Swiss-Prot record:
NCBIfam families: PRK00811.1 (NF002010), speE (TIGR00417). Gene3D superfamilies: Spermidine synthase, tetramerisation domain, Vaccinia Virus protein VP39. It holds the Pfam family Spermine_synth. It catalyses: S-adenosyl 3-(methylsulfanyl)propylamine + putrescine = S-methyl-5'-thioadenosine + spermidine + H(+). One of its GO terms (biological process) is spermidine biosynthetic process. S-methyl-5'-thioadenosine binds at Q36, E111, D142, G143, P167. Its EC number is 2.5.1.16. The keyword Transmembrane does not apply. This is Polyamine aminopropyltransferase. Keywords: Cytoplasm, Polyamine biosynthesis, Spermidine biosynthesis, Transferase. Its main location: cytoplasm. It comes from Thermococcus onnurineus (strain NA1).
Length: 282
């Protein structure tokens, strides 16, 4: 796993020998932060590549293929999302997409690793001014602890974390889901990325099962994401009486999205028979 100097390539190896790779021009930056190994590459055809502990986090060209489905389905399904919490997302892409919604009055982003924010600010323009937006509040802290201790309440909670293995497993635990449920306002929505159903099957099913113990409804959908082992999975938790299968198309028109199509929101729930049967057994 990692950078191959002879091939001028970065390859991320997933379980069972599945790999996703990019030809790279150069390594722009690397460091060991307090929490993880951070690398940044310039690829031949996809812009900059952000890597944390050997795992691809962001591909600059096409990053909307991840950030749009993570943010807009829940934001458009909620009738009036005013207060939003983002856990993770240090590159700023999720914050950027959240702040495109005019209903948002406050968006709090909690990122544990300040170096991810700084490298993203210096080398990339993914945030596109989101960090400076007066509605945004950046907190450098552990998202698990923040959620446990905060008195704030939110309409939408978005978890933009690393894969559901290793240290990030805490973000996929029943206890974490319960804290999130408690910090949602009545009729709130929660979403997390959840890895590849084909390569992180057990981890995803565990999260789906534990969310089902906590939230009033749980929805699964997947989306092709550039740079990830697609299709990539997302899990949505509903608190109260919100129909996640219906989105506000009038608000959606103002966004001019590139990847996620609100007019075909219902297609998110069309999944392969294999996946549907897996979820039905949970």
């Amino acid at each position: 796993m990692g950078f191959n100097e002879q091939e001028n390539a970065f390859i991320e190896w997933y379980p069972r020998g599945y790999g996703v790779g990019f030809r790279v021009k150069e390594r722009l930056f690397e460091t060991q932060t307090k929490y993880q190994r951070l690398e940044l590459y310039e690829t031949e055809g996809f812009g900059k590549l952000l890597v944390l502990d050997g795992t691809v986090q962001l591909v600059e060209m096409g990053e909307e293929s991840y950030h749009e489905p993570l943010v807009h389905p829940v934001m458009l399904a909620h009738p009036n999302p005013r207060r939003v919490l983002i856990i993770g997302g240090g590159d700023g892409g999720t914050l950027r997409e959240v702040l495109r919604h005019k209903t948002v009055e406050k968006a709090i982003m909690v990122e544990i690793d300040e170096m991810v924010i700084e490298v993203s600010r210096i080398y990339m323009n993914v945030a596109r001014g989101a960090f400076e937006d007066p509605r945004a509040e950046l907190i450098v802290s552990d998202g698990v602890e923040y959620l446990k201790n905060t008195d704030e309440k939110f309409d939408v909670i978005i978890v933009d974390s690393t894969d559901p293995v290793g240290p990030a497993k805490m973000l996929f635990s029943e206890g974490f889901f319960r804290n999130a449920y408690e910090k949602l306002n009545d009729n709130g929505l929660y979403i997390t990325q959840a890895g590849s159903v084909y390569l992180f099957t057990n981890e995803l099913l565990d999260a789906y099962r534990d969310m089902g113990k906590v939230f009033d409804e749980v929805h699964y959908f997947s989306f092709p994401v550039i740079g990830y082992a697609s299709p990539w999975s997302f899990l949505v938790g509903v608190k109260g009486d919100i129909n996640f299968r219906k989105v506000d198309l009038q608000r959606a028109k103002e966004l001019k999205l590139y990847y996620y199509d609100p007019e075909r929101h219902e297609t998110l729930f069309q999944m392969p028979k294999y996946v549907r049967e897996l979820l039905e057994k949970v």
